[in-house]
Amino acid sequence: MMTLLQSAALAEAQTGLKINDLFEGRIIPQERMIETRVRGKTLAKYQLSYYRSVRFTVGESEADRVLKMVEDDSKGHFATGGKSRKTVFGKEHSVNFKTQVGRQGDRNCFLCYQAWWRGNTSEREVTVIYMEGSVKSLEQLEELLNND
C-alpha cells in the first residue's frame, strides 16, 4: 500500500508542467530513455526531497522541442532565476537551461535541461532533471551542488 501511495505522489510531482509529458513517455517513448528517481535521505544534504531525471538521444528538432517545453514551464509557474548558457569547446557543443518553476505544497520545484553534441551532427544527448525540496532558490541549489 505504501508503495502505491509513493508511486501516486511521484506521478503528481510534475503535474501542471508541460515537461510532465516527457517524463510520462508521451514525447520520447519510455524505452528510449534512461530514467532515475530518488527520494529520501540521500538528497537531504542538498535540501531536496525528490529528484527525477531522464536521459535520451534525439535529433536536433526533438531536442529543441523539449527545451521549448522547459522554457515554457519556466514562464508559466512563478519562475525565478532562469539561466541559459550555450557553450562551444572545439567541436563539442552544449546548451544548458536551469530554472525554478514554482511550488508543490511546501516544496520549491526546479527544472534543468542539458543537450550535448559533437561536431555538425544533428543527434543530441539530452538530460532533463526535475527536483523538489526546501532549498530556497536556484542559486542556493547550485551552491549546494557545487560544494559537494
Please place each PLM-identified region on the residue numbering.
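Short, hydrophobic/aromatic-rich beta-strand segments within well-structured domains
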Residues: 98, 109-115, 127-129
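C-terminal partner/receptor-binding element of secreted or periplasmic proteins
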Residues: 121-148
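A structural motif
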Residues: 15-18, 29-32, 85-102, 107-109, ...
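Solvent-exposed coil/turn segments that connect beta secondary-structure elements
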Residues: 61, 115-118, 134
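Short, low-complexity Ser/Thr-rich regulatory SLiMs
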Residues: 101-103, 114-119
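Mature extracytoplasmic domains of secretory-pathway proteins
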Residues: 54-108
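Bacterial Sec-dependent N-terminal signal peptides
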Residues: 1-19
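Early exported N-terminus immediately downstream of N-terminal targeting peptides
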Residues: 15-64
